[in-house]
Amino acid sequence: MKALSKLKPEEGIWMVDAPKPEVGHNDLLIKIRKTAICGTDVHIYNWDEWSQNTIPVPMVVGHEYVGEVVGMGQEVRGFTIGDRVSGEGHITCGHCRNCRGGRTHLCRNTSGVGVNREGAFAEYLVIPAFNAFKIPDDISDDLASIFDPFGNAVHTALSFDLVGEDVLITGAGPIGIMAAAVCRHVGARHVVITDVNEYRLELAEKMGATRAVNVAKENLEDVMQELGMTEGFDVGLEMSGVPSAFHSMLDTMNHGGKIAMLGIPGGDMAIDWSKVIFKGLIIKGIYGREMFETWYKMASLIQSGLDISPIITHHYSIDEFQQGFDAMRSGQSGKVILNWD
């Protein structure tokens, strides 16, 4: 079968002919229709320090996808051949305290599809049936293929009450932009998103952000004054992993504010903890998606009228995968879809 693999410990991704994966007793065999390129895949392509310390070589990569069930193990229940599915990319152990307590997204033994085990950039993928999510008929393949990053946005955004609140999002990558759309959809008052990438800031405004702020050109506190804000942001969503962005968030949060952090800093990050203490801030780390509450919320948000389709800006056939990666690496894109049909 065709597959995209990290063949060598150097920059790049390569098309290979890989063996079709074998199906275990509790597994689904999924024929892939569409995949999306994640920022993680770009890290793997670039072969940065994180990738060098994490990714086994060679390995098929990718973890954002939609496909059709074409085979299943003898113990599988609840699925039928032909079901359209996406899937949770975090494979959990099922026996640690958090798994047994129903907090599977906090499994200490998590294995990532396309990160620690064979991924979805292939004609076929095998995952445990537990990890599969049936896609409702009224949700398109394009949207279903980005449920993984959309889930990161939903999990982060819905960590705290947003109704009538003022929200600051630092980092206008695709996940930050989708989070802005979620915040507006569920009733936030002002949603301000910051970055230095003009293309993505414009995309954020199309997706519903009240103000998209290029912090290289504008002062965030001036924008707050322009919006009539007098006490600071109630909720912060840190999506960038950039220390200066987080410092700006701490400066502009209201007392008693709440921060959800999804962005991963490149190294140790020093902050002024006195601001956290004296402002009484709550900081919550976010990893992945809640299984499977986030998935049901994703489907419900779309079915209730949330439109995230503008975040998908490029489509390529799988044979044009290099152009897809080039688009993602340029920063002049939203989500990039690779078609396998």
Curated annotation (Swiss-Prot):
Q: Which locations, inside or outside the cell, does it occupy?
A: Cytoplasm
The record's Gene Ontology biological-process terms are: L-threonine catabolic process to glycine
Q: Which reaction does it catalyse?
A: L-threonine + NAD(+) = (2S)-2-amino-3-oxobutanoate + NADH + H(+)
Give a single Pfam family match.
ADH_N
Q: Which GO terms describe its cellular component?
A: cytoplasm
Query: What is the free-text note on the cofactor?
Result: Binds 2 Zn(2+) ions per subunit.
Q: Which residues are involved in binding NAD(+)?
A: 175, 195, 200, 262-264, 286-287
- For the ligand (Zn(2+) 2), the binding residues are 93, 96, 99, 107
| Gene name for this UniProt entry | tdh
**Protein function:** Catalyzes the NAD(+)-dependent oxidation of L-threonine to 2-amino-3-ketobutyrate.
Q: Which cofactor does it need?
A: Zn(2+)
**Per the UniProt entry, what species is this protein from, by scientific name?**
Shewanella pealeana (strain ATCC 700345 / ANG-SQ1)
Asked if the record carries the keyword S-adenosyl-L-methionine, the reply is: no
**What EC numbers are recorded for this enzyme?**
1.1.1.103
* Gene3D superfamilies given in the database record: Medium-chain alcohol dehydrogenases, catalytic domain, NAD(P)-binding Rossmann-like Domain
Coarsely, its chief localization is cytoplasm
Which UniProt keywords are present, listed alphabetically? Cytoplasm, Metal-binding, NAD, Oxidoreductase, Zinc
| Name of the protein described by the UniProt record | L-threonine 3-dehydrogenase
PROSITE patterns tied to this protein: ADH_ZINC (PS00059)
InterPro entries registered for this protein in UniProt: ADH-like_C (IPR013149), ADH-like_N (IPR013154), ADH_Zn_CS (IPR002328), GroES-like_sf (IPR011032), L-Threonine_3-DHase (IPR004627), NAD(P)-bd_dom_sf (IPR036291), PKS_ER (IPR020843), Zn_alcohol_dh (IPR050129)
**Residues that bind Zn(2+) 1:** 38, 63-64
The opening ranks of the lineage are: Bacteria, Pseudomonadati, Pseudomonadota, Gammaproteobacteria, Alteromonadales
Q: What pathway does this protein act in? A: Amino-acid degradation; L-threonine degradation via oxydo-reductase pathway; glycine from L-threonine: step 1/2
Q: Where is this site: Important for catalytic activity for the proton relay mechanism but does not participate directly in the coordination of zinc atom?
A: 148
Subunit field text: Homotetramer.
